[in-house]
UniProtKB/Swiss-Prot annotation:
Keyword terms, alphabetized: ATP synthesis, CF(0), Chloroplast, Hydrogen ion transport, Ion transport, Membrane, Plastid, Thylakoid, Transmembrane, Transmembrane helix, Transport
Family per record: Belongs to the ATPase B chain family.
Lineage: Eukaryota, Rhodophyta, Bangiophyceae, Cyanidiales, Cyanidiaceae
Entry annotated with the keyword Protein biosynthesis: no
UniProt name for this protein: ATP synthase subunit b, chloroplastic
CDD domains (UniProt xref): ATP-synt_Fo_b (cd06503)
Function description: F(1)F(0) ATP synthase produces ATP from ADP in the presence of a proton or sodium gradient. F-type ATPases consist of two structural domains, F(1) containing the extramembraneous catalytic core and F(0) containing the membrane proton channel, linked together by a central stalk and a peripheral stalk. During catalysis, ATP synthesis in the catalytic domain of F(1) is coupled via a rotary mechanism of the central stalk subunits to proton translocation. Component of the F(0) channel, it forms part of the peripheral stalk, linking F(1) to F(0).
Superkingdom, taxonomy of origin: Eukaryota
InterPro entries named among the record's database cross-references: ATP_synth_b/b'su_bac/chlpt (IPR002146)
Subcellular localization, as worded in the UniProt entry: Plastid, Chloroplast thylakoid membrane
GO molecular function annotation: proton-transporting ATP synthase activity, rotational mechanism
Subunit structure: F-type ATPases have 2 components, F(1) - the catalytic core - and F(0) - the membrane proton channel. F(1) has five subunits: alpha(3), beta(3), gamma(1), delta(1), epsilon(1). F(0) has four main subunits: a(1), b(1), b'(1) and c(10-14). The alpha and beta chains form an alternating ring which encloses part of the gamma chain. F(1) is attached to F(0) by a central stalk formed by the gamma and epsilon chains, while a peripheral stalk is formed by the delta, b and b' chains.
UniProt KW NADP keyword: no
Amino acid sequence: MHTLLETLLESNVINIAILVVILIRFARQVVGEILVQRQQQVKEALEEASNRLKLAEQQLKTAQEEWSQTQEQINQIEEEANQTAQVVKEYWLKQANEAIAQLKTKTQQSLSQASRQVAKQIRQTLIELAIEKVKQTPIDGSQILDRHISLLSYHEAKNR
């Protein structure tokens, strides 16, 4: 019995050893294939990430260039707007100054005309008063007339 048991144990041990060797070989192949597949997946993921990074960097560069161009356009528009505003301001200041000058001229003309009109009216009134006084005064009328005529001449010379 002992020999049979020993034989069985020895054959079981041999079978187990064979099984372990087979399992180790298959496990190595399976684990190796799994590792190769995993390595390939990691490699592909890294390549994809690298490609996405390159694409993102390129898009960032493009966006920065567009931003720079936009800033330049904004600066140009602001400069043009300032120039246009200055031109418009100068135009309206010129128009206002011309209007003021015209108003001054018209006012001066109006004042001159009114002054002449008043002087004319004063002369007329003085003449009428002088004539009336001459008619009412028995004194020598030529003296009174001479006096009023000299007054008229004085006022006329003064208003010129």
